[in-house]
């Protein structure tokens, strides 16, 4: 029997903005097992990497068939974007309140498709000693620096 996902942490990093970037995800299961993921992009921004981490986390949940989930991000941009700003952007044809095109619309559209009412988006302050957030940050920074970190995958689907 598969254990339920208890919580997920996501983070993104970028060396220069834009510049080489990385993202990290740590999935914690109720049975104590962990699944870590990450990736890199050659020329990107911190916000895009934060969004890519959230997308990877939600795709993992969807593949695992494990809603609901608590998703922690240290990006206010991602948290507010998905929980507050997105409905207005869609109503205005993907324009901001100032009438400008929404940045990262391609990724917002993917996040919008993956997001469900069963996702509980939570903000966690970055670099505050939270173990899940710190581990995601280390994964994201390693990928941004061109290194392949050792990823714990005690639970594979």
From Swiss-Prot:
Per the record, the major location class is: cytoplasm
Cofactor field? Mg(2+)
Per the record, the GO terms for biological process are: DNA replication, removal of RNA primer
CDD domains recorded for this chain? RNase_HI_prokaryote_like
Give the enzyme class.
hydrolase
Could you tell me which residue ranges the RNase H type-1 domain spans?
Answer: 2-145
Q: How is the cofactor bound?
A: Binds 1 Mg(2+) ion per subunit. May bind a second metal ion at a regulatory site, or after substrate binding.
| GO-annotated molecular function | magnesium ion binding; nucleic acid binding; RNA-DNA hybrid ribonuclease activity
Highest taxon listed in the record's lineage: Bacteria
Record: residues binding Mg(2+) 1 = 11, 50, 74
Question: Would you name any one GO CC term?
Answer: cytoplasm
**EC number, UniProt record:** 3.1.26.4
Q: Which UniProt keywords apply?
A: Cytoplasm, Endonuclease, Hydrolase, Magnesium, Metal-binding, Nuclease
**UniProt catalytic activity:** Endonucleolytic cleavage to 5'-phosphomonoester
The UniProt similarity line reads: Belongs to the RNase H family.
What this chain does, per the entry, is described as: Endonuclease that specifically degrades the RNA of RNA-DNA hybrids.
Instruction: State the oligomer form and interacting partners.
Output: Monomer.
What name goes with this protein? Ribonuclease H
Q: What organism, scientifically named, is this protein from?
A: Cyanothece sp. (strain PCC 7425 / ATCC 29141)
What taxonomic lineage is listed for the species of origin? Answer: Bacteria, Bacillati, Cyanobacteriota, Cyanophyceae, Gomontiellales
**Gene this protein is translated from:** rnhA
């Amino acid at each position: 029997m598969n254990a339920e996902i208890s919580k997920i942490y996501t983070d993104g990093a970028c060396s220069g903005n834009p510049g080489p970037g990385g993202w990290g995800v740590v999935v914690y299961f109720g049975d104590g097992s962990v699944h870590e993921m990450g990736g890199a992009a050659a020329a990107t921004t911190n916000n895009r990497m934060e969004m890519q981490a959230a997308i990877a986390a939600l795709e993992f949940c969807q593949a695992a068939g494990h809603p609901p989930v608590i998703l922690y991000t240290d990006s206010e941009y991602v948290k507010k974007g998905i929980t507050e700003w997105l409905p207005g952007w869609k109503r205005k044809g993907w324009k901001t309140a100032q009438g400008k095109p929404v940045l990262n619309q391609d990724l917002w559209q993917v996040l919008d498709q993956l997001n469900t009412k069963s996702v509980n988006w939570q903000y966690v302050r970055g670099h505050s000693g939270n173990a899940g957030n710190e581990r995601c940050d280390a994964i994201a920074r390693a990928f941004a620096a061109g290194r392949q970190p050792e990823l714990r995958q005690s639970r594979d689907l």
